């Protein structure tokens, strides 16, 4: 079920070439397109291709490999990674990597026989067994994949600075114990991620404390899914002062707690700045063996400064505290 705090827009990819060269895609896939990052279904290890004599011997067959996002779609012209393996493991128990290439459609000259071919496109991919004969042939891979672009805003449509926003993409299905397999961490906003069609669990983090939103998002083959998450949080800055509007007192230890007393964040300095989810909190400030505290409320979208008055005549000052 798609979370109600998601606003999704689907836009059909105009052509596969457009998807391959869309702004930001190349950078977004840098983790997925490196040759060592392969994750083949049922293939945990493989032997690297051996640097032997060229394959161009008397009897080779040419195989041309192409891939599309959807059935009858246009060929993907860039961003693919092809890996060709022998079908039987060697003495070391690994499948030997016969050949590999990057780009779009690729042709290989191989000894006739059976091979396993893996095509990866970002985080999308497919594996297929092929047969190579003496005659040239073409094999097409349908990746059944699409793109996902994520963004977030604060309550009321307030834009969140991109440097304070990150996403993590997980498999939707939970494993025993409630855990999910992590697909891609630390995704920047407005980055296009290529994924196989399906539902994914997305975690959006605003800041680095407790402003976290979780959503299930569906990726459709051949389409770009744009999802905007709504956070309900605010950036808060705390300072200890001797009087309202005064200068912040240095060397202050800070502890932020929920109204039930659960710790949220600790820091040291004249100021304590952090993003907090909306709700009620207590801020505790310790300076020179004195402890001061104040209750405050975080309202979504309303960034604010919280002053704690260092008034030693009030009951909140505790002398001799450790």
Report the location of each language-model feature.
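N-terminal secretory signal peptides that target proteins for export/translocation
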Residues: 1-8
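Bacterial N-terminal signal peptides
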Residues: 11-22
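Sec/Tat signal peptide C-region and signal peptidase I cleavage site
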Residues: 23-28
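Structured interaction patches on ligand/partner-binding surfaces of diverse proteins
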Residues: 29-50, 102, 121-144, 207-230, ...
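A short, amphipathic beta-strand motif
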Residues: 61-71, 148-157, 235-244
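Short, ordered, surface-exposed loop/turn motifs in non-cytosolic proteins
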Residues: 72-91, 156-177, 243-262
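Short, acidic Ser/Thr/Gly-rich low-complexity loop/linker segments typical of extracellular
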Residues: 87-104, 174-189, 258-270
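Short Pro-Gly-centered beta-turn/loop motif in secreted/extracellular proteins
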Residues: 102-114, 121-123, 186-201, 206-209, ...
């Amino acid at each position: 079920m798609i979370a109600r705090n998601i606003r999704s827009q689907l836009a059909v990819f105009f052509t596969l070439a457009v998807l391959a060269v869309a702004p930001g895609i190349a950078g977004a896939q840098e983790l997925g397109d490196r040759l060592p990052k392969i994750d083949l279904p049922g293939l945990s290890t493989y032997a690297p291709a051996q640097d032997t004599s060229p394959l161009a011997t008397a009897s080779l067959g040419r195989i041309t490999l192409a891939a599309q996002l959807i059935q009858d779609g246009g060929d993907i012209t860039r961003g693919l990674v092809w890996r060709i393996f022998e079908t039987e493991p060697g003495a070391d128990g690994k499948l030997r990597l016969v050949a590999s290439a990057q780009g779009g459609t690729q042709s290989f000259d191989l000894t006739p026989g059976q091979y396993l071919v893996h095509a990866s496109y970002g985080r999308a991919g497919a594996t297929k067994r092929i047969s190579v004969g003496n005659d040239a042939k073409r094999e097409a891979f349908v990746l059944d994949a699409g793109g996902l672009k994520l963004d977030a805003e604060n309550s009321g449509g307030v834009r969140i600075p991109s440097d304070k926003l990150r996403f993590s993409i997980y498999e939707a299905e939970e494993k025993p114990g409630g855990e999910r397999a992590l697909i891609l961490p630390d995704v920047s906003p407005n980055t296009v991620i290529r994924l196989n069609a399906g539902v994914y669990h997305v975690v959006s983090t605003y800041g680095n404390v407790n402003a976290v939103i979780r959503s299930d998002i569906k990726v459709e083959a051949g389409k770009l899914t744009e999802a905007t998450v709504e956070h309900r949080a605010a950036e808060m800055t705390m300072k200890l002062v001797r009087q309202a509007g005064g200068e912040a007192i240095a060397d202050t230890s800070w502890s932020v707690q929920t109204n039930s007393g659960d710790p949220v964040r600790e820091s040291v300095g004249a100021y304590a700045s952090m993003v907090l989810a909306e709700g009620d909190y207590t801020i505790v400030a310790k300076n020179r063996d004195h402890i001061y505290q104040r209750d405050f409320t975080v309202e979504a979208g309303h960034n604010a400064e919280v002053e704690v008055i260092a008034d030693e005549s009030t009951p909140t000052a505790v002398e001799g505290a450790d």
